[in-house]
C-alpha cells in the first residue's frame, strides 16, 4: 500500500475560522481561538496520521497589511505557506468579497497546486445567500474546488478531509507517526496564556503582549511553569496586573485550567509581568520570540 503525505496550508483573512478548522481536523486544540483579529501570530503545524497517510495541516496568521515589524514577520509565515504547500486551503466566510491583499489573492488564482476554497460559517446564512456566494467565488477563483462548510459545527469538514487524502502526493511520512505537532510544550504554554490575555483585555493591550516560558519542569504528577508576560510600557504592565493583582490572577487561573486539560496533569503556574520596550518593532526581539525567520 502506497503511503501519502503532504502539507495542507490554510490561508485567509483574519477571523474567518482557520484555527477552528485546523483544530477540527486534528481533533485537538492546537491553535488558540478568540474573536479578535491577529489571534494567530505563528505558523502552527497540526499532524493527522493514518495507516497509509500523514496530513500536515498548517494554520497561518490572518492576512493583513503590516503596520509594524511583528505584523511583517507574521506575513512572512503566510508567504512560506505558499512555498511548501501540496494543497492550498483558501478560507473565506459568508459575506466576504475579497482577500485583503491583492498580491496574495493573485498567488491563489494562479496557483499550480490544488486549491480548495472553503466557504465557512454557512450556519449564519440562508440558501439564497449561500448560492450567491458560491457563484461569486466560482467566478473569482475558477481554479478552486469550492466546499461550503461550518468549521464550528463540523459540517462538511469530513468531506473536505476525504478530498485532501485523495490529493496527497505519494511520500513517506515527514514526522514520526505518533507526532501531533512540530511545536514544543513551551509554545502551547505561551499561547494559552496569550489567549487568556486576548479574552480579558481590550484595545491595544493584547497586541502589545508576548509570553516567554522561563521554566517548564515536569514531574510524575505535576508540571511547574514560570512564565513572563512581556509588555511595551509601564502603563500596560499596570493594566495587566490590575488592582491588587486581581486581573493577573484571573488570567493565571484560566490558563492553568486549560493547561491541565491539555497536558493531563496538575499545573503549578507562576506569572510575572515585565516591560520589554517596543519589542514589536525590534528585529532582535522578534527573532528571539520565534517570529523573524530571516
Model region roles, listed by residue range:
Residues 1-82:
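Conserved G1/Walker A P-loop phosphate-binding module
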Residues 17, 156, 247:
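Conserved glycine(s) of the Walker
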Residues 31-33, 100, 172-176, 199-211:
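Active-site phosphate-binding and catalytic loops of NTP-dependent enzymes
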Residues 40, 63-65, 97-98, 125-126, ...:
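Catalytic P-loop NTPase motifs of RecA-like helicase/translocase cores
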Residues 52, 76-144, 217-219:
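Conserved C-terminal guanine-recognition region of P-loop GTPase G domains, centered on the G4
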Residues 59, 120, 150:
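Active-site glycine-centered loops adjacent to acidic/histidine catalytic or metal-binding residues
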Residues 114, 123-181:
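Canonical P-loop GTPase G-domain recognition
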Residues 185-294:
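P-loop NTP-binding site
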Amino acid at each position: 500500500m502506497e503511503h501519502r503525505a503532504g502539507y495542507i496550508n490554510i490561508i485567509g483573512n483574519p477571523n474567518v475560522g482557520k484555527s477552528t478548522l485546523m483544530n477540527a481536523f486534528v481533533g485537538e486544540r492546537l491553535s488558540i481561538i478568540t474573536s479578535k483579529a491577529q489571534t494567530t501570530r505563528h505558523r502552527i503545524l497540526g499532524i493527522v496520521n493514518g495507516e497509509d497517510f500523514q496530513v500536515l495541516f498548517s494554520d497561518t496568521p490572518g492576512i493583513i497589511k503590516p503596520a509594524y515589524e511583528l505584523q511583517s514577520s507574521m506575513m512572512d509565515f503566510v508567504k512560506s505557506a505558499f512555498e511548501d504547500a501540496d494543497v492550498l486551503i483558501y478560507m473565506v466566510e459568508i459575506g466576504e468579497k475579497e482577500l485583503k491583499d491583492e498580491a496574495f489573492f493573485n498567488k491563489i488564482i494562479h496557483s499550480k497546486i490544488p486549491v480548495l476554497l472553503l466557504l465557512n460559517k454557512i450556519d449564519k446564512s440562508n440558501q439564497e445567500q449561500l448560492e450567491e456566494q458560491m457563484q461569486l467565488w466560482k467566478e473569482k477563483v475558477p481554479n478552486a474546488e469550492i466546499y461550503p462548510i461550518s468549521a464550528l459545527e463540523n459540517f462538511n469538514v469530513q468531506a473536505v478531509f476525504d478530498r485532501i487524502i485523495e490529493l496527497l502526493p505519494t511520500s513517506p511520512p515527514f514526522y514520526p507517526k505518533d507526532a501531533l505537532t512540530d511545536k514544543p510544550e513551551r509554545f502551547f504554554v505561551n499561547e494559552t496564556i496569550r489567549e487568556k490575555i486576548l479574552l480579558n483585555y481590550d484595545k491595544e493591550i493584547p497586541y502589545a503582549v508576548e509570553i516567554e516560558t522561563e521554566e517548564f519542569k515536569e514531574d510524575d504528577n505535576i508540571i511547574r511553569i514560570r512564565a513572563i508576560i512581556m509588555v511595551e510600557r509601564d502603563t500596560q504592565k499596570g493594566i495587566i496586573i490590575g488592582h491588587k493583582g486581581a486581573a493577573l490572577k484571573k488570567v493565571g487561573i484560566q490558563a492553568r485550567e486549560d493547561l491541565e486539560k491539555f497536558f493531563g496533569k496538575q499545573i503549578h503556574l507562576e506569572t510575572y509581568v515585565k516591560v520589554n520596550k517596543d519589542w514589536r518593532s525590534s528585529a532582535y526581539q522578534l527573532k528571539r520570540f520565534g517570529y523573524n525567520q530571516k
